Regions:
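Post-cleavage N-terminal segment of exported redox proteins
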Residues: 1-40, 63-106, 278, 297-298, ...
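The canonical Cys-X-X-Cys-His
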Residues: 51-61
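Outer-membrane beta-barrel "beta-signal"
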Residues: 53, 417, 443-457
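Outer membrane beta-barrel
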Residues: 62-66, 98-114, 119-252, 265-281, ...
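Outer-membrane beta-barrel and related beta-rich outer-membrane complex signature
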Residues: 192-200, 254-256, 298-300, 339-343, ...
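Detector for outer-membrane/organellar transmembrane beta-barrel domains
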Residues: 281-407, 411, 423
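C-terminal beta-signal and adjacent terminal beta-strands/loops
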Residues: 415-419, 423-442
Length: 457
């Protein structure tokens, strides 16, 4: 399922603070709300719990402010509301419970127009809902919080578990503030604080009615909702962030991974390191992240396919003309040792590589309008076994090269409602600009216009 609902992360999560510095964080949130004119916004349960509108945590959803990142870092438990508590009871029990409901929902609807309709399908496909999600999120105890999502996906009629991130967060006292915690989650990078890594990167919404490129690194959602990750993280002095996690296959709908599930051999390590700094009102983050996974493609013994992904990313934020510019970029390189696929005759070479580049910038003049433009590129080894000739989704020359741009205009009549128009244009698709699939389809035939509505409540 396409991961979309970062907004609801802050709209619906209840919090209680383990931090003595809670007053400072709340003052920061009120400052962001005031700066973005959000004093009287009517929003879902995040506002009910804190008295703050979406703009405390988002320039516009889904793009987080510094306070939004603090909220997630501290385990979804920050609040300024009184809790239902019991301390040192006679039977040894204790309780810290948010009085607010932790239930919220999200609905998206869309219309998709392709430059040239797919064979034997109707163009201008409409979806209502495209996705319908229910969220259970917020404070579990004073130091434990959760974000969890159940999603009905209209295009395939399925309903199941979506993103989950369960966190424990605490801090140390002293001259150098340190936040540390543990995350238990089901999608690599769902726990990330920035809008550069795969789960929360732009575009924040897409469509299943348009074809997608044949190749992407494993970190681009290959294990989304089908792996269980356990990791530890820390933020030192608000400057250096580090995380190390390990993932093991946890296939939805299976009690244990079977031979055809693409199970991880053992565990797959994931790492994250970032340096952030504010220069006056300007913010900059530089980071790196990566993962190594050995996967059984068809059987649970014998040769595996090994993937090593290493990425670098950056995020830049600065006020301009009463609004905000946010720029995000990432480059992710993957080395592939495909012993299992090569032995099965499905790859021409056992050693391949793949690289993706994504860069985009948004301008938010106020809380109602947003403009975003981005560029994307995928390149890699030519291999007619991995990328064979096939109508629409194949490659005539065995190359994964795909290039293009995305533009999006958003109008938010309320902070929890969005009407958007998104256009994706391709210069290359699966290795070519003309007749890329060997069946006469051009890259520009896949150019896509997406009209959508997005509500969180």
């Amino acid at each position: 399922m396409r991961a979309t609902p970062w907004l609801v992360l802050t709209l619906l999560s209840g919090f209680s603070s383990p931090l003595p510095a809670m007053d400072d964080l709340y003052d920061l949130a009120r400052g962001y709300a005031a700066a973005h004119g959000a004093g009287h916004g009517a929003v879902p349960s995040y506002a009910r719990q804190t008295g703050l509108a979406c703009s405390a945590c988002h320039y516009q959803f889904l793009t987080l402010t510094p306070f939004g990142r603090e909220f997630k870092l501290n385990g979804y438990v920050l609040t300024n509301r009184p809790l239902i508590t019991e301390k040192d009871s006679t039977n040894g029990g204790s309780l810290d419970l948010s009085p607010a409901s932790l239930v919220s929902a999200m609905l998206t609807a869309s219309m998709t127009h392709l430059n040239d309709a797919l064979p034997d399908t109707q163009n201008d496909a409409v979806a209502l809902p495209q996705e319908l999600s229910v969220f259970l999120a917020g404070q579990i105890s004073s130091k434990v919080g959760i974000f969890s999502q159940l999603t009905y996906a209209g295009p395939d009629g399925s309903f199941g578990i979506d993103n989950v991130d369960l966190r424990y967060a605490n801090h140390t006292s002293g001259d150098t503030p340190v936040v540390y915690g543990v995350t238990l989650n089901n999608s690599p990078s769902v726990q990330d604080l920035w809008n550069t890594t795969p789960v929360w990167g732009f575009p924040f919404i897409g469509t299943d009615a348009a074809p997608g490129p044949a190749a992407s690194p494993i970190l681009d959602d290959a294990f989304a909702q089908n792996a269980l990750g356990l990791g530890a993280y820390t933020m030192i002095n608000g400057l250096i962030y580090g995380e190390f996690s390990v993932y093991r296959s946890a296939i939805q709908g299976q009690a244990a991974p079977d031979a055809e599930s693409g199970a991880i051999d053992g565990v797959a390590p994931y790492w994250r390191l970032a340096l952030q700094k504010e220069f006056g009102h300007t913010y900059l983050m530089l980071g790196t992240y990566g993962m190594h996974a050995s996967v059984f493609p068809d059987v649970l013994s014998g040769p595996t396919n090994a993937y090593t992904d290493i990425g670098v990313d950056a995020q830049f934020e600065t006020p301009v003309g009463g609004g905000e510019i946010v720029a995000r970029g990432t480059w992710l390189h993957e080395d592939q040792t495909l012993d299992a696929t090569f032995d099965a005759g499905d790859a021409n070479s056992a050693n391949n590589d793949l690289s993706t580049l994504r860069f985009n910038a948004s301008y938010y003049p106020n809380q109602r309008f947003g403009l975003t433009a981005g560029y994307f590129q995928t390149t890699g080894s030519t291999d007619t076994g991995l990328y064979p000739v096939d109508p629409v989704e194949g490659s005539a020359n065995g190359s994964p090269k795909t290039t293009g741009f995305i533009g999006e205009v958003d109008y938010d009549p309320w902070e929890n409602v969005r009407l958007g128009l998104q256009y994706t244009g391709y210069g290359n698709f699966n290795g070519g600009s003309t007749d890329y699939d060997g069946s006469g389809r051009d890259a520009s035939d896949n150019n896509t216009l997406l009209l959508f509505a997005w509500l969180a409540f």
